[in-house]
Amino acid sequence: MDASMSFRVQNGLMYGVGNKGGIYTIKIPTGTQDVVVTKVSQLQYALNGTNFGVDFNPAADRLRVISDNGQNLRHNLNDHTTIQDLNLTTPPIEGTTKGVSAAAYTNNDLDGTTATTLFDINTTTDQVVIQSPANNGTLAPTGNLGIDAGINAGMDIFSTLSGGKTVDNTAFATLTPSGAGTPSLYTINVFTGQATLVATDAAKAKFPLNITDVAISLTGT
């Protein structure tokens, strides 16, 4: 079972969800390379799946957790409550959708007029999908990745701000093509689904370790 992580717009901190549903802050204090992990909350429902997508809804300040088994949770870090939303589905196909293992919201800012959209990656169909309404778990494909990706995927969206409001979004994903031992870093066109390596030299885009997620700082550093 893999854990996932995300930055929270409201306080700029990185959070991780462990394989037992614990929620942690992950910090690297200035002047040291030591990672400080502190438990701050706990999901009220057991995780159901092997691979998970995690991201904060920047508008609602809720932590979204989805799984390759179709689980769809929403957690409030302020009062530590978890809502079990409807399972992931892809109408008109009946039943729970399996294979969704990465998730990311657009428009990561604190502007109250900014809306946000949740995009996922389904590695069974190798597609980018919109999850809307997110609480209903309803999925609609936007396009194909263009690669045969393994189930172990991660995604995050970096928002470029001007005057505190998002003016551009860039999606990144860690994907493991069929036959590859470890993931590579891609940019994702969320509207067409197309995955593109971040480097022209494929070796430079490849991770040395089998990482399970990607979280981009809110400042891009």
Regions found by a protein language model. Give the residues of each.
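Structural motif
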Residues: 20-27, 70-76, 115, 124-133, ...
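Beta-propeller fold detector
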Residues: 33-44, 77, 81-94, 130-148, ...
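Repetitive beta-architecture junctions, highlighting loop-to-beta-strand starts
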Residues: 12, 21, 35, 61, ...
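Conserved beta-strand positions in repeat-built beta-propeller and related beta-rich domains
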Residues: 8, 14-20, 56-58, 65-68, ...
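Hydrophobic alpha-helical segments and helix pairs
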Residues: 38-87
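Structural signature of eukaryotic scaffold interfaces centered on beta-propeller domains
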Residues: 3-11, 45-61, 95-114, 149-167, ...
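Glycine/small-residue-rich interface belts in oligomeric ring/scaffold proteins
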Residues: 1-42
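A mid-sequence, solvent-exposed acidic-amphipathic segment
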Residues: 104-156
